């Protein structure tokens, strides 16, 4: 199993961004102001309080520890990297590419079971984001916790990761 010390600082930064990108992908799929706040909070909690598969526990613990030490930059950490002039489809492609890159860095140094477990954890983070806020409805009445767009986003993430 790999840990933070197995990666260069540049590699580690990209690995750290990967679960954030996965969460942002879901947020961008069906954006709403109040939902976004709940979803960003859920993303942070999913990263920090993760219960990942055994093959990736140490790696995720290192990510969670570093994420917890971050301050204001948490919200802008990955979002600042997304091209400002990009339309939604371009931004979504960019985010999925960044998720692939983070997984590829791990795949270079980790065993296949650890890579699979990391991918599963990324989907779990994205799912926690999708389930964080009701979408649709009016004044909190009606709606559903995972919208069709969010379900599609989760499926796209899973497909991108080969799950």
Where are each of the predicted segments found?
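Small-residue-enriched hydrophobic alpha-helices in membranes
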Residues: 1-163
